[in-house]
């Protein structure tokens, strides 16, 4: 096909196609999905003159390899890994050349963008894979990835030498204290339990994934009754009976019955997403500016 662009040689620890996610389907129980770190993904696209929400490949940690099927430009962002191409800048790739992502050093999710954006089937208006819901699938060795649309490849002018501002590059090993807004049941926790949450250094557990990030630390000793299930959004912080907070992520449930301590600021969801298992994170009350 004229728009075939990359072949998956080795999928590594796993990857999917993701864009900015699907909107308007939560009431039917369909989560938004989409990129875990929209800051990194949008920068990879902008470097190539793509729209910020163009479809990218999202990769977990390390080990993926791709072969170019034709000349094109790519940009890689997000979690830092040893690679045979530089990060955070447009890179020309010739047909037959390989892109190899090796050992991970910081962060959890890496993004591979191609000039024009990746194509593929849409589900409810989005190409974002939601594997648990049978919308799209994880990448497999041998998969052929296509460019969006069928237009001939045209390498954009003036992109060689581009990079992102240094202030936009994040040190994923040292996230800031993440901002939290009040949630509908925040008042149920009272001042003592809320202060405990903000004063505790929490650890991201190995069970954390695209559905939710589970945190370990000194439990919030708060034994509330289960509530009626009600809508939750990406970034909702729920506290189950064991006192260990769970933060809803992109593939998370659309309703939940645990008390909601707070809502992670949308700009900080990407920061939390890049925290690896075992990494520590702190939170702070968000304030109006």
Q: Where are the predicted features?
A:
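Conserved "landmark" site that anchors the functional core of diverse proteins
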Residues: 1-289
């Amino acid at each position: 096909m004229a728009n075939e662009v990359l072949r998956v040689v080795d999928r590594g620890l796993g990857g999917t196609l993701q864009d900015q996610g699907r909107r308007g389907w939560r009431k039917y129980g369909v989560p938004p999905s989409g990129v875990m770190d929209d800051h990194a993904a949008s920068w990879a696209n902008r470097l190539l003159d793509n729209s910020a929400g163009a479809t990218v490949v999202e990769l977990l940690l390390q080990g993926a390899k791709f072969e170019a099927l034709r000349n094109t430009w790519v940009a890689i962002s997000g979690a830092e890994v040893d690679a045979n191409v530089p990060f955070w800048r447009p890179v020309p790739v010739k047909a037959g050349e390989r892109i190899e992502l090796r050992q991970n050093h910081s962060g959890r999710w890496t993004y591979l963008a191609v000039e024009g954006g990746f194509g593929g089937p849409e589900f409810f208006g989005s190409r974002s894979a939601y594997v648990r819901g049978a919308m799209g699938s994880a990448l497999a060795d041998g998969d052929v990835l296509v460019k969006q649309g069928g237009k001939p490849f045209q390498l954009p002018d003036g992109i060689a030498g581009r990079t992102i501002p240094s202030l936009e590059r994040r040190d994923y090993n040292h996230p800031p204290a993440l901002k939290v807004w009040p949630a509908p049941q925040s008042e149920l926790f009272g001042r003592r339990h809320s202060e405990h949450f903000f004063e505790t250094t929490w650890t991201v557990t190995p069970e954390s994934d695209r559905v939710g990030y589970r945190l370990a630390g000194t439990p919030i000793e708060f034994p509330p009754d289960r509530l009626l299930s009600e809508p939750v959004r990406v970034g909702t912080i729920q506290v189950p009976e064991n006192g260990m907070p769970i933060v809803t992520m992109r593939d998370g449930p659309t309703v939940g019955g645990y008390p909601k301590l707070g809502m992670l600021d949308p700009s900080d969801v990407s920061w939390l997403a890049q925290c690896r298992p075992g990494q520590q994170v702190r939170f702070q009350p968000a304030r109006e500016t």
